[in-house]
Amino acid sequence: SCSCKRNFLCC
C-alpha cells in the first residue's frame, strides 16, 4: 500500500 506521509509520489 501507499502512504503519502512516507512517499509523496503516492499522493
From Swiss-Prot:
Any one cellular-component term (Gene Ontology): extracellular region
Record localization: Secreted
Tissues expressing this chain: Expressed by the venom duct.
Changes after translation: Pc16a is the amidated form, whereas Pc16b is the non-amidated form.
Function, in words: Potential neurotoxin. No target has been identified for this peptide.
Note: Negative results: the native peptide has no effect on nicotinic acetylcholine receptor (nAChR) subtypes human alpha-4-beta-2/CHRNA4-CHRNB2 and chicken alpha-7/CHRNA7. The synthetic peptide has no effect on a wide range of mammalian and insect voltage-gated sodium channels and voltage-gated potassium channels.
Protein name: Conotoxin pc16a
Cystine crosslinks: 2-10, 4-11
PTM sites of type Cysteine amide: 11
Predominant place of localization: secreted
GO molecular function per UniProt: toxin activity
Keywords: Amidation, Disulfide bond, Neurotoxin, Secreted, Toxin
Written domain comment of the UniProt record: The cysteine framework is XVI (C-C-CC).
